[in-house]
Swiss-Prot record:
An annotated GO cellular component: cytoplasm
Organism: Paraburkholderia phymatum (strain DSM 17167 / CIP 108236 / LMG 21445 / STM815)
Needed cofactors: Mg(2+)
Main location: cytoplasm
Pfam families, alphabetized: CTP_transf_like
Assembly mode: Homohexamer.
Family label: Belongs to the bacterial CoaD family.
Pathway assigned to this chain's UniProt record: Cofactor biosynthesis; coenzyme A biosynthesis; CoA from (R)-pantothenate: step 4/5
Residues marked Transition state stabilizer (site): 17
Name of the protein: Phosphopantetheine adenylyltransferase
Record bears the keyword ATP-binding: yes
GO molecular function, one term: pantetheine-phosphate adenylyltransferase activity
Function: Reversibly transfers an adenylyl group from ATP to 4'-phosphopantetheine, yielding dephospho-CoA (dPCoA) and pyrophosphate.
Record-listed ATP binding positions: 9-10, 17, 88-90, 98, 123-129
Length: 168
């Protein structure tokens, strides 16, 4: 049985992420989606919200598990007995960072492979950062995220705007 881990912040989980999960889950016996509790990033959605979103969107895949992790990816990979780390590459600009991370992961986990996957054509330009920015500026993100995620984005943006108005 081959277990793979697909780590990320998923802030928010997009149609591009789901595309990779759908395709990777057809390759591996088990795909563990690792939602990172990263100290280096200031997420728009907190960890609990990101886990809820991931479970809402990905819950229908029988061989996909959604879990959070903190600390080094190598420890999460080991705990889950994974043999593969799945990473998405949207553009050449992603490659340099991902290549360096794959090299470090190979050093730390010599028996674990990193597999790069490119998103389907219609999702190559989508990123969580761009989706958040569009949502915060009042734009339509319905083509980039699932309806439940769009609703959460709208609610979060409205709450932030109310908080700003209350504390000018």
């Amino acid at each position: 049985m081959v277990v793979a881990v697909y780590p990320g912040t998923f802030d928010p989980l997009t149609r591009g992420h789901e595309d990779l999960v759908r395709r990777a889950s057809s390759i591996f016996d088990t795909l563990v989606v690792g939602v990172a509790d990263s100290r280096n990033k200031r997420p728009f959605f907190n960890l609990e919200e990101r886990l809820e979103i991931a479970n809402e969107v990905l819950g229908h895949y029988p061989n996909v598990q959604v879990m959070s992790f903190k600390g080094l990816l190598k420890d999460f990979v080991r705990v889950n007995n994974a043999r593969v780390i799945v990473r998405g590459l949207r553009a050449v600009s992603d490659f340099e960072y991902e290549f360096q991370m794959a090299g470090m992961n190979r050093y730390l986990l010599p028996d674990v492979e990193t597999m790069f996957m490119t998103p389907s054509d219609q999702y190559q330009f989508i990123s969580g950062t761009i989706v958040r920015e569009i949502a915060q500026l009042g734009g339509d993100v319905s083509k980039f995220v699932f309806p439940s995620v769009e609703k959460r984005l709208q609610d979060k943006v409205a709450a932030l705007e109310q908080a700003r108005a209350a504390n000018p």
